[in-house]
Amino acid sequence: MSHTSILQFRTANCKNCYKCIRNCPVKAIRVTNQQAQIIEEQCILCEKCIAVCPQHAKVEHDDIPAIQRVIASGKKVIASVHPAYLARYGWNSIGDLEKYLQKMGFWQAFDAAQGAAVMKEEYTRLLREQQQKKLVISSNCPVVVRLIRTRFPNLTGNILPILPPVEVAARLAKQDFC
């Protein structure tokens, strides 16, 4: 998926206020033909531009129609649910939410926190094995990883070689349910 498919601009809404440009931490936005555009190679996908745009000209890509098509096709779809979602929307447990998601057509729901637990064990192991004391950077946050790779490439080797928790959770869900 390209970055322009994740962050999208509604060109008709842009009023050239430049708030997105002023607030982008990596200066990955330029104006061309009076429309803000993301410089893909520099964007770290932090979504700061979405948060500050008073015109709502920047939006996240909506995957809901694609998910609905996959569910409608009859495939077994597993929802990987981040624990923050449960807290934010007042669900008591993944089980309660799973019932709701199944009514919407999902086959199962999986608690993505399980991926973080596995990742924590791997981080602990790697840090214990580390011979030399050096700066290490977690691979947990894709924005941080992208920032390091685009702005501080000399630190790329300091990123711990561990899959992000969402990927670990997806693999665990596949193991458990497929």
Where are these regions (language model features)?
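Iron-sulfur cluster-binding cysteine motifs and their immediate structural context
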Residues: 2-9, 15-44, 48-64
